[in-house]
């Protein structure tokens, strides 16, 4: 693992050195509440197919067009915790989806209104959204939901809806899109999109805090998972084994990409 990381660092250094010959200066600008930002704590950032930057804060959803910020209200939601935006994504049909503290929302672009979707089924926090074409994978506090062809399917990793492993924090697909990987607060799970089979792996057996996976991403045949107490750990998909990566100086990882 260390040799792989050194190799990647070397590639990046070579690329940077080459680019410096024709490098253009980057311009940074901060967007603050005086610009219209609804809150200083930004939990999610997403760039849509039209080039808009969507910002999910503790107070709702904002859109930044490069000049100004427009705020979108969650109508009927008063509590700050319930307003908190956890995730944003867009399906191929240009539908923008938002997960917040109480459920799933969709933006009606024509009317610029946020509409709550299937509240009778998804009545809990939505922590992760993953779009694949027009299919939407929804990770919630009470399991996985899949919206496809107008149908909503619910999958639970445990029959007990309140089990910790049903708290899904992040999602990603494998390379051939046949398996969906779930980062939960109690282990790593896979869900076969072919036959519905569910498998699980634990970083450290009988050590619950070591299995609190906050986020994940995939590079080739390796998953990288951010934890709440163990830093970044990797999972070799073919070998089905965990390993530590190099120390980052902090063991609490809130996001990874």
Identify what each model region corresponds to.
Residues 1-257:
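Carboxylate-rich, polar loop motifs that coordinate divalent cations or form catalytic acidic clusters
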């Amino acid at each position: 693992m260390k040799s792989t990381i050194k190799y990647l660092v070397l590639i990046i250094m070579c690329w940077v050195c080459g680019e410096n010959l024709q490098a253009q200066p980057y311009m940074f600008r901060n967007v603050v509440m005086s610009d219209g930002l609804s809150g200083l704590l930004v939990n999610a950032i997403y760039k849509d197919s039209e080039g808009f930057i969507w910002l999910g804060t503790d107070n709702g959803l904002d859109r930044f067009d490069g000049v100004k910020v427009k705020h979108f209200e969650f109508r009927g939601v008063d509590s700050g915790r319930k307003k908190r935006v956890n995730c944003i994504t867009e399906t191929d049909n240009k539908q923008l989806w938002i997960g917040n503290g109480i459920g799933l929302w969709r933006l009606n672009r024509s009317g610029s209104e946020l509409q709550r979707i299937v509240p009778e089924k998804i009545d809990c926090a939505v922590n992760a959204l993953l779009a694949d074409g027009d299919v939407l994978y929804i990770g919630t506090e009470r399991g996985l939901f899949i919206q496809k062809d107008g149908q909503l399917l619910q999958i639970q990793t445990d029959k007990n809806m309140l089990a910790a492993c049903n708290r899904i924090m992040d999602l990603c697909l494998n390379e051939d899109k046949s398996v969906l990987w779930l980062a939960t607060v109690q282990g790593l799970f896979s869900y076969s999109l072919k036959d519905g089979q569910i498998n699980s792996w634990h970083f450290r057996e009988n050590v619950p805090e070591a299995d609190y996976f906050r986020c994940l991403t995939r590079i080739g045949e390796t998953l990288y998972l951010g934890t709440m107490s163990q830093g970044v750990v990797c999972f070799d998909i073919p070998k089905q084994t965990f390993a530590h990566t190099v120390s980052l100086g902090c063991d609490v990882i809130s996001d990874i990409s």
